[in-house]
């Protein structure tokens, strides 16, 4: 690590601690030439995840899209913002832990529905109706029957 004051390349670590919700390490360093101290951050490089959409186009994974869809499905239901964000974070973590570089949107949708089913059945049916593109009342009834099993 190059010293920002004298550009010397060698330093020693004086202090090290977790930062940013344990996603980074904050280090205090001391330059071995000028003895000035400075802070550096070490962070794991995120691997970009691409979502394969139904039309086979690809776009970057965006947790905010999951949150937005959940907010719509859970509108006027007893589901808190914290629960919605927890679902989105769990799904993001699940995808990251599997080291997936590409993931089908269908897989994400199924994970969302699995989580919603346990939290609020009405929100589940709302989300399913958009996600599975229900065309008529019979499709709704089939989904509700499956939910009641």
UniProtKB/Swiss-Prot annotation:
Domain of life assignment: Bacteria
GO biological process, one term: negative regulation of DNA-templated transcription
Keywords: ATP-binding, DNA-binding, Metal-binding, Nucleotide-binding, Repressor, Transcription, Transcription regulation, Zinc, Zinc-finger
Domain annotation ATP-cone: ranges: 49-139
Molecular function in Gene Ontology: ATP binding; DNA binding; zinc ion binding
Cofactor(s) required for function per UniProt: Zn(2+)
InterPro entries: ATP-cone_dom, NrdR-like_N, RNR_NrdR-like
Pfam family, one: ATP-cone
Tagged with keyword Transmembrane: no
Zinc finger (unnamed): 3-34
Details of cofactor binding: Binds 1 zinc ion.
PANTHER family membership: TRANSCRIPTIONAL REPRESSOR NRDR (PTHR30455:SF2)
Family: Belongs to the NrdR family.
Reported function: Negatively regulates transcription of bacterial ribonucleotide reductase nrd genes and operons by binding to NrdR-boxes.
Protein known as: Transcriptional repressor NrdR
Lineage start: Bacteria, Bacillati, Bacillota, Clostridia, Eubacteriales
């Amino acid at each position: 690590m190059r010293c920002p004051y004298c550009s010397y390349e060698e330093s020693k670590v004086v202090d090290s601690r977790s930062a940013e919700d344990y996603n980074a390490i904050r280090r205090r360093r001391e330059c071995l030439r000028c003895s000035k101290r400075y802070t550096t951050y070490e962070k794991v490089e995120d691997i970009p995840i691409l979502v394969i959409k139904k039309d086979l186009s690809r776009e970057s994974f965006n947790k905010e899209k999951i949150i937005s869809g959940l907010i719509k499905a859970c509108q006027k239901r007893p589901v808190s913002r914290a629960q919605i964000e927890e679902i989105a974070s769990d799904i993001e973590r699940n995808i990251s832990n599997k080291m997936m570089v590409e993931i089908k949107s269908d897989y994400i949708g199924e994970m969302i529905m699995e989580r919603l089913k346990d939290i609020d059945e009405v929100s589940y049916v709302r989300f399913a109706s958009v996600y599975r593109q229900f065309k008529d009342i019979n499709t709704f009834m089939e989904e509700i029957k499956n939910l009641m099993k």
